[in-house]
Structures are given as C-alpha cells and as structure tokens.
C-alpha cells in the first residue's frame, strides 16, 4: 500500500513539472512573438507613437495591407523619382479635396491616406486592412460590389472596357459640426464622391513554384471627396460661384445675382422655371442620374456639365447639390445648390434652345434708351401710339416722375397755331366751356384733356330733375311734357384796369390752373344712380358722418327744405342792386388776367367778395323740344374769404397739387377735403354752394292745387335768425361784409334733397361741380363794368329768385304783391 501511495506522489510531481515547463515555454513563445510583432510594427511605415501602441492583430492587418501595396507597386511600371518629385509628394494630399483609398476586389482597404482623419474623423490605422463594408451604409453595399467587379469578358472590337468609376458612397463619420471626434457607435453618415478607376496588375513571376499561373491582381483606386453642407462652407465663395435654391421638382425658387454677370440671366426670369430647360441636351442623362442619387443619398456633385447661356452658347459648371430636410418631420423640403462656373461663355453665337432665340428676335434695350427714342420722335407719332408705348412700359414712366427740386413747367394744352389761349377763350363765353358742350373744337379738346372722367364719357347737355326750389320749377315738375333749355351765360364788360402791386407776387407764386374751366368736372347721366344730389349735401356738409358717400338709397322729397317761409306780417327791408356797395378789387392770376373778354380786375383795392351774377337774356336762351323736361343745374363752389390768411396748399385742401395732379376731386376726396379746409380756415366756412336754375314757361300758365299745397307746407317754418334762413333755402346765398375786414362772414351750405319721380325715370341728369379754389373766387369776383357787380344780401338771394322771361328781379312791395297773388 505504501509503495502504491509513493508512486502516485511521483506522478503528481512530474505532471506539475511538465505543466510548469509548458507554461514557461508558452511564456517564452509569447515573448518571442511579441518581440517579432514589435519589430514588425516598427517596420511598417507608421509613426513610432502609432506603431508602438498597436496590438498584434492590428500589426498583422497593417502588415498584410502593406505587403499588398508593395505588390501593386512592384507590378506597376514605376519611374524612379527624382528629388523634385520626392519633395512634391507631400503637397499632393494638401491639393486634394479628399483622401485616397485603394480597395481590393473583395473590398479590403489596403491603403488609405493619412488625411482621412481631417474629413472623416477616423484615423488611417483604424481603417487600413478593414473591409469597406464595415464602414459604409448598408444601402450602398450592392452598388459598391458592382463598382469593385471587373468583367474580364470579351470586348467588342474597337472598344475598350470602361474602367472608370464614379459613384456616391455614404461612410461613417465621427466628426461633429464643431470639428470634435465622437465614438464610432455614434457616428453619422457622410456622402463621399468617389472617382477613380480599376487597375489590373500582373506580377513579375507569372508562374508559381508549382507551375500554376497566378491570377492578376485587381484593385480599385479612388479619390474620395466629401461634399460639404451649404451651412458649413468655410471657404468664401468667389465671383465665379453663385447659389441657387430649387423646389423638389428642380424649379428655381431663388438664384444669386452673380448669375447675371456669368450667364446673362436675371434672377427674376429664372424663378418658377425648371433647371432642365437650361441644361445642354448631351448632359441631360448624366444629370438625371445625378439628381436621382441626390434624392437617394442626400448630396451629390454633378461634375462638370454644360449650362446654356442667355444670349447663346454655354458655360461649364460644376454643382454641389444638397437636400435640406425639415427638422420636424425629417421630410425633404428644398434643394440648395452651390454652382461653380469653371469657364466663360463658349460658342456664344450658337443657339441651343428656344429661350436663347428670344434675345435674338427681341433685342433688349435699356429703359433710358427706350424713353429717349420715344420722346425724340414724338412729333411724327400720333397720340394713340404714344399712349400704347407708355402703357406697355409702366416701369419706364418712373423716369418721367419729377424729383425733389425739379422745376415744374405747366403744359400747354392748346394747339400749335398762332392763336393764344386768350384768343381761344374770347371765341366762346367761359361758362359755355364750363357748363355746356363747347362749339369750339379747340376748347372741346382742352376740356376733354382736363376732364378726370374717362374719354368714353362724352359731354352731354346738362340736365337736372331734382331741384324744384322755385315755384315755377315745381309747376314744371308736375307737367307731363316739360321742355328743356340750353342756357348761355355771359358777363358784362368793363375797361381794363391795372392790378394792384401785390398782384405780381400772387401771379408768380400761384400754382393754380390756367382757367376756371379746369376747376370743374361734369358727371354724365349714366351716373345718376350712384351720384345723387343728396351726395352733394353729404359731401359739402360740415357735420356729415356718412361712411359711404355714394349711397344709392332713394329718399323722399323734403318739401320743407326747398324754400323759406316768409311771413307776411314782417316787413323786411329789401334792398335793390343800386343800394349795394360795388365789388372790391382782388389780385388775379396771370391766366385770368389774359382773358379780357370774360374777366377783368376792377378799380377797388379791397379783397374780393365771392359773388357771381349771371344774366340770361331771351336772345341767349335756346329752347329745344324733347320728350321730357330736363333741369339745368350748376353747382359752384367758392372758398373762404380772401382776407383770411392762406396756408400753403396741400394735396387734401386743394384739388390740384403743386405738381399739377388732377386726381383730387370732391367726389374722390370726400370728407377729407372739408376736414382739411376747416383746419386751414377754422373761423369761416370753406365752400359756398350756389345753385342757379332757370326755365321758360308760358306767362299765362296757372298753378294747380299741388303748387298751393307745396307753398302752404313751406310757410309752416319759422325764421329764427339769418343763419337758419340761409340753411333752409334751396338756393345758396352769397354774402359778405365789405366794410368789416377783421371779421369773417359765416357762409351757409346748400342743402339739396333730390329724388326721381315716376314720370321722370328715363330722364338723364348731369351735374357740374366746380371745385373750391382761391383762384376761382378771384376770377368770379371780377366783372367787366367800371361799377362792380352788386353784392347780394341773404334776402336778395332767397326771395328775389328769377322768374320766367324777366331780366329784372322783383323788389320790395312788388315782391310782396306777387306773393299775395300766388296765395
């Protein structure tokens, strides 16, 4: 038993010794292996700090890659580098916009340049020897295998096998936008544009030791260029580069202005146009595939292609396109392109598309040249052609707009004959031009040119059907077949008198129009439904609150507002014309002073009183028989008294601006004109409205009961003071205090109510509105007699209404007698 136990102990001791020897042998082998790997690592063309920290697997991987590279270099016909080439080797990688990568036919990266760390964040030794499929996007693996395949089949005669490769590859990148390095597990995908070719190398010893022929070695040599994101472009863009943005269907939504200098296109004309319209036809297939890759991988570089210039020819361009994704839903939003123009315009005389023919058929000229040629040939062109050209070129009209400090020269609307404007105005009385169609063709042309209404609205006879202010007018209103009249107004003449010394300054600085005919515009009967007489009340009333002045609602006739009630028990002291003081002198504009047959300054030196008297004789009345009776109504507007200090004219208080604008009118300005005028003359009314209406009837015509009922209704009113009497009348008043210059006279507004009766539905209405102006006040305040026109008091204007066929107005007891006879 003891012998058996001793034998077992010996066996245990021997086994332990063997194990210890085995461990020592293994330790010795590992140490020798480590020494070999250490020596092998230092033989690799790597920095010492890199090679000293490599593990055995890395050393083997790098060594195998190095041996393969050496095999490729030995297989190729390499020239002996001289000293100059050796010095230039260090600059090659700096000149590249990417890194160099060499792949075997199975996808191993046997070589990669050391500048890969600059673009991808991964170091050279981390990638060398690894398979490219470990670092690329899974969706690109199939395309990558196709690029690595070299087909050795038969090639058609006369054609060489294509060994060029160009594709886009998504590879892992550990660089952040700030240039920092992240973990490989958090790496993002960066698009690389890989261009290169396949090389097939035959070794020097074509046969192995066993007598078998070795297959040629195939590798893919690539230059990988990362496509920068537009938001991370570090290098400033030069003058040969322009940016563009496109929708997902490749239509321009933005383009840089530099494209104008490079290709001739204006950025505005490219918006909404597809970029395919400007590609050269031979490059369309290549660009279509490139755009397909862009939507698949997010970024592409088109390479050099031809893009058509505007006036013919093409330029070579290289574009970097990037798809911009929405940060919320990660959906593609737009495409941003950085376009590098690498050449000038080539074959600029050659036309490639229809867009380029537009410049040949329609040469583009500058706006300045067009306007110069247009106005230098204006004598030989008619007005219609000039209007058409100006209408087609609205942008060119801005060249004609006056700038600050320019001298404004009033245009002469008269003819080119030897007759002056004074002689033209002498031919026809001025009121005929203002209120009635002129018989003079020259004056008609002037009126048409000054009219703010469209040219299609030709002047028609003035008619009115809504002013039964006088008893005789009311009688004619109720008649079934009234007659219409055409009135002609004249002014008495006096001798020429020189104006006061202060008139010169007024003439020089006055920006007013040339004649009173420019202060009016007429409204045709076609506008009756929109431009009713109640609009005049709302337009010139101080307390109006109407929001819509052009109201088309019909209102009943307010009979109490047509004429004042004059009680018989009160004895009003009515004054005749000879008891009134003559008109006072006023300064006139040079245009009004030239019209000798119509207006002349008087001898008075006081400021003018805004009065007007019109006499219609039987010789001047023209009766025209028609189906219905048409009224003739004239609404004349006057400004405040001239002795009130005037403020500088503005666009809202004057119907004409300093530059001669004709856009302002009572019907357009509305309430704003009255408000501005009230601010400039707060102590006096701004507009005095006078309605003159006259008819001819048979003297023996009797009033029917309707007239009596109308007058009875009128007499129910009471007169509290003069102001209320003025506002109640149907005819506005003209009053002024000639002896008191310090106080301003309150002027009343004409209040008119109008409607259409059933018998007058077909009648046509025409209203003449004379816009308020100081010039009109001065013009109308002057007459042609040595003794000026008499000043009318409030009672004269209200009571002494002109009756049929009479040149003189009833006065005093005769008027009271006439009123008693009516009752």
Swiss-Prot record:
Keywords: Acetylation, Activator, Cytoplasm, DNA-binding, Hydroxylation, Isopeptide bond, Nucleus, Phosphoprotein, Repeat, S-nitrosylation, Transcription, Transcription regulation, Ubl conjugation. The modification Phosphoserine is found at residues 247, 551, 576, 589, 654. The modification S-nitrosocysteine is found at residue 797. S-nitrosylation of Cys-797 may be responsible for increased recruitment of p300 coactivator necessary for transcriptional activity of HIF-1 complex. Residues 531-575 are annotated as: NTAD. Residues 170-191 are annotated as: Required for heterodimer formation with ARNT. Induced by reactive oxygen species (ROS). The modification (3S)-3-hydroxyasparagine is found at residue 800. Gene3D superfamilies: Helix-loop-helix DNA-binding domain, PAS domain. GO terms for biological process: axonal transport of mitochondrion; cellular response to hypoxia; intracellular glucose homeostasis; positive regulation of cytokine production involved in inflammatory response; positive regulation of DNA-templated transcription; positive regulation of transcription by RNA polymerase II; positive regulation of vascular endothelial growth factor production; regulation of gene expression. SUPFAM superfamilies: HLH, helix-loop-helix DNA-binding domain (SSF47459), PYP-like sensor domain (PAS domain) (SSF55785). Pfam families: bHLH_HIF1A (PF23171), HIF-1 (PF11413), HIF-1a_CTAD (PF08778), PAS (PF00989), PAS_3 (PF08447). Residues 85-158, 228-298 form the PAS domain. This is Hypoxia-inducible factor 1-alpha. It comes from Bos mutus grunniens (Wild yak).
């Amino acid at each position: 038993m003891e012998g058996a136990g001793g034998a077992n102990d010996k066996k245990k001791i021997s086994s332990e010794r063997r194990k210890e020897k085995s461990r020592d042998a293994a330790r010795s082998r590992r140490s020798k292996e480590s020494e070999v790997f250490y020596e092998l690592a230092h033989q690799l063309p790597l920095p010492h700090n890199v090679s000293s920290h490599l593990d055995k697997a890395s050393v083997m991987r790098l060594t195998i890659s190095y041996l393969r590279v050496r095999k490729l270099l030995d297989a190729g016909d390499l020239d002996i580098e001289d000293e100059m080439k050796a010095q230039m080797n260090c600059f090659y990688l700096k000149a590249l916009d990417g890194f160099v990568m060499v792949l075997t036919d199975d996808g191993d990266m046997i070589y990669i340049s050391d500048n890969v760390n600059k673009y991808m964040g991964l170091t050279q030794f981390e990638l060398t020897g690894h398979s490219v499929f470990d670092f690329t996007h899974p969706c690109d693996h199939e395309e990558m295998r196709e690029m690595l395949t070299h087909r050795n089949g038969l090639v058609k005669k006369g054609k060489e096998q294509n060994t060029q490769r160009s594709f886009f590859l998504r590879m892992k990148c550990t660089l952040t936008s700030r240039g920092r390095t992240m973990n490989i597990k958090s790496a993002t995908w960066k698009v690389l544009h890989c261009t290169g070719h396949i090389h097939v190398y035959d070794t020097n010893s074509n046969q192995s030791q066993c007598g078998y022929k070795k297959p040629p070695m195939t590798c893919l040599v690539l230059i990988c260029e990362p496509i920068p994101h537009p938001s991370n472009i570090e290098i400033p863009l030069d003058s040969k580069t322009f940016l563009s943005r496109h929708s997902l269907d490749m239509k321009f939504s933005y383009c840089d202005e530099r494209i104008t200098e490079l290709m001739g296109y204006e950025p505005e004309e490219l918006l909404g146009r597809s970029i395919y319209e400007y590609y050269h036809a031979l490059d369309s297939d290549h660009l279509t595939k490139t755009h397909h890759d862009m939507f698949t991988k997010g970024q592409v570089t088109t390479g050099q292609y031809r893009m058509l210039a505007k006036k013919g020819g093409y330029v070579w361009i290289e574009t970097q396109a990037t798809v911009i994704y929405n940060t919320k839903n990660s959906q593609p939003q737009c495409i941003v392109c950085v376009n590098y123009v690498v050449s000038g315009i080539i074959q600029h005389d050659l036309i490639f598309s229809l867009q380029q023919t537009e410049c040949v058929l329609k040469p583009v000229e500058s706006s300045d040249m067009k306007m110069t040629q247009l106005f230098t040939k204006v004598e030989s062109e008619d007005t219609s052609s000039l209007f058409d050209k100006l209408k087609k070129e609205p942008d060119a009209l801005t060249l004609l707009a006056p700038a600050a400090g320019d001298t404004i020269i009033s245009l002469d609307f008269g003819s080119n004959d030897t007759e002056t404007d004074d002689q033209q105005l002498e031919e026809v009385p001025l009121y005929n031009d203002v209120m009635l169609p002129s018989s003079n063709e020259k004056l008609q042309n002037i009126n048409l040119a000054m009219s703010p209404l469209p040219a299609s609205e030709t002047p028609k006879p003035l008619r009115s059907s809504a002013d039964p202010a006088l008893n005789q007018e009311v009688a004619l209103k109720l008649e079934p077949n009234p007659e219409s009249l055409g009135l002609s107004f004249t002014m008495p003449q006096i001798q020429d008198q020189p104006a006061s010394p202060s008139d010169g300054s007024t003439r020089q600085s006055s920006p007013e129009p040339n004649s009173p005919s420019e202060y009016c515009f007429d409204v045709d009967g076609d506008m009756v439904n929109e431009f009713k007489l109640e609009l005049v009340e709302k337009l010139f009333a101080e307390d109006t609150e109407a929001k819509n002045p052009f109201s088309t609602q019909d209102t009943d006739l307010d009979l109490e507002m047509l004429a004042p009630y004059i009680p018989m028990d009160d004895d009003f002291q009515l004054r005749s014309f000879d008891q009134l003081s003559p008109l006072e002198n006023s300064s006139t504009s040079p245009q009004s002073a030239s019209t000798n047959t119509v207006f002349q300054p008087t001898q008075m030196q006081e400021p003018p009183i805004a009065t007007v008297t019109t006499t219609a004789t039987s010789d001047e009345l023209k009766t025209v028989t028609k189906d219905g009776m048409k009224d003739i109504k004239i609404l004349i507007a006057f400004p405040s008294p001239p002795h009130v200090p005037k403020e500088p004219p503005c666009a809202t208080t004057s119907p004409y601006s300093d530059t001669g604008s004709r856009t302002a009118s009572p019907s357009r300005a509305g309430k704003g004109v009255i408000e501005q005028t009230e601010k400039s003359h707060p102590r006096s009314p701004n507009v005095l409205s006078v309605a003159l209406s006259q008819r001819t009837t048979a003297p023996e015509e009797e009033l029917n009961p309707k007239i009596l009922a109308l007058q009875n209704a009128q007499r129910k009113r009471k007169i509290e003071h003069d102001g209320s009497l003025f506002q109640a009348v149907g005819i506005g008043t003209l009053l002024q205090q000639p002896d008191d210059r310090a106080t301003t006279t309150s002027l009343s507004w004409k209040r008119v109510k109008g409607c259409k009766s059933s018998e007058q539905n077909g009648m046509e209405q025409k209203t003449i509105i004379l816009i308020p102006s100081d010039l009109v006040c001065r013009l109308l305040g002057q007459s042609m007699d040595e003794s000026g026109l008499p000043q009318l008091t409030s009672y004269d204007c209200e009571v002494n209404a002109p009756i049929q066929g009479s040149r003189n107005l009833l006065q005093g007891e005769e008027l009271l007698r006439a009123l008693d006879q009516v009752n």
